[in-house]
Amino acid sequence: KRLRWHQTNPRKLGKNKIFFFYRPSDRKTGLLTLNIKIPKNFKSTLKTKNINLCRVNIGGFNAKTKCLENIPADIEIDSETKKVEIYPFSPLPSNKESYAVVFKVSNPQKSGLYQFHTFGKSSGAIPVASYLGSWTVRIDQL
């Protein structure tokens, strides 16, 4: 499933802020954990202090995309399997709010398309991990 995303700078080697959105239509249930699989060829340094989870206002033609409030969460990066695991202190509810994982990164040297996959563990009597969708981020040549 194709998910929405937004970035501030598409140029290669540029400082970038990438918003990976979790809209209400993307979440059927509340989410206990979020896993983001980073593509192998996305060569950029990720640090836990540069990743956060927040309630977000998705911008458009006349509004800016920005975080409204940060959601406290434990963030772990597994550099071998190239996965980011996010454990919010309280589960993300399945309400009408939009949430986003925000990466503050330097773009990789190679331009092209990078596909990030996300998995979520649903909150309920029996937590079930399931595939939520993918974001295809484009890095430009210029």
Model segments located where?
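Helix-rich interaction surfaces within compact, conserved domain-sized segments
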Residues: G30, V105-L142
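Soluble periplasmic/extracytoplasmic beta-strand elements of cell-envelope proteins
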Residues: T33-K37, E85-Y87
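Solvent-exposed beta-hairpin/edge-strand motifs
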Residues: N35-L68
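Low-complexity, intrinsically disordered segments enriched in Ser/Thr together with acidic residues
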Residues: L92-K110
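Extended, solvent-exposed segments with strong compositional bias
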Residues: K64-K96
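Serine/threonine-rich, low-complexity linker/repeat segments that form flexible spacers/stalks
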Residues: K1-R27, N35-K37, D140-L142
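Solvent-exposed coil/turn segments that connect beta secondary-structure elements
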Residues: P39-N41, E80, F89-P91, K104-S106
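Extracytoplasmic
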Residues: K15, T29-T33, T48, T81, ...
